[in-house]
Swiss-Prot record:
<dbReference type="GO" id="GO:0000967">
    <property type="term" value="P:rRNA 5'-end processing"/>
</dbReference>
<keyword id="KW-0378">Hydrolase</keyword>
<protein>
    <recommendedName>
        <fullName>Putative pre-16S rRNA nuclease</fullName>
        <ecNumber>3.1.-.-</ecNumber>
    </recommendedName>
</protein>
<dbReference type="GO" id="GO:0004518">
    <property type="term" value="F:nuclease activity"/>
</dbReference>
<dbReference type="InterPro" id="IPR006641">
    <property type="entry name" value="YqgF/RNaseH-like_dom"/>
</dbReference>
<keyword id="KW-0540">Nuclease</keyword>
<comment type="function">
    <text>Could be a nuclease involved in processing of the 5'-end of pre-16S rRNA.</text>
</comment>
<dbReference type="InterPro" id="IPR012337">
    <property type="entry name" value="RNaseH-like_sf"/>
</dbReference>
<dbReference type="InterPro" id="IPR037027">
    <property type="entry name" value="YqgF/RNaseH-like_dom_sf"/>
</dbReference>
<dbReference type="Pfam" id="PF03652">
    <property type="entry name" value="RuvX"/>
</dbReference>
<keyword id="KW-0963">Cytoplasm</keyword>
<dbReference type="InterPro" id="IPR005227">
    <property type="entry name" value="YqgF"/>
</dbReference>
<comment type="similarity">
    <text>Belongs to the YqgF nuclease family.</text>
</comment>
<keyword id="KW-0690">Ribosome biogenesis</keyword>
<dbReference type="GO" id="GO:0005829">
    <property type="term" value="C:cytosol"/>
</dbReference>
Length: 139
């Protein structure tokens, strides 16, 4: 089963996809946000292209575990997405994933700030999805 991972921000949506065995996540694109309708259309195309059966949406939480304003926006987006796609949409704790992604790009591949901005959301989506996939294998 293929699973889609999303890192939903105000300006962009990072997108990652799993392999068919739901073992390995790979970043595939970053969607520039325009409107809910256009954002969902772009996600729908990916869902159809890869025969996705589930979507994992990174849920930003505060360090104490509470949900703040950004988390509320993401929940609203995910719930609407579930209605449109008619496949399971689950939320996954994304605390520190963007920080992890940025640290990797700085330390791991010594990438410049300009290049980092282009791939950070896709990498964060990959980390979110891989974390989810790993948890499913271990449960």
């Amino acid at each position: 089963m293929r699973v889609l991972g999303l890192d939903v921000g105000d300006k962009t949506i990072g997108v990652a996809i799993s392999d068919v065995s739901s073992t390995i996540a790979q970043g595939i694109t970053t969607i520039r946000r325009k409107s809910f309708v256009e954002d969902v259309k772009a996600i729908e195309e990916i869902v159809k292209k890869y025969s996705v059966e589930k979507v994992v949406v990174g849920l930003p939480k505060n360090m104490n575990g509470s949900i703040g304003p950004q988390g509320e926006k993401v929940i609203k987006f995910g719930e609407k997405l579930r209605e449109v796609l008619r496949i399971p949409v689950v939320f996954w704790d994304e605390r520190l994933t963007t920080l992890q992604a940025e640290r990797f790009l700085i330390e791991g591949v010594d990438m410049s700030r300009g290049k980092r901005k282009k791939v950070i959301d896709k990498l964060a989506a990959t980390i979110i999805l891989q974390s989810y996939l790993d948890s499913q294998k271990n449960s």
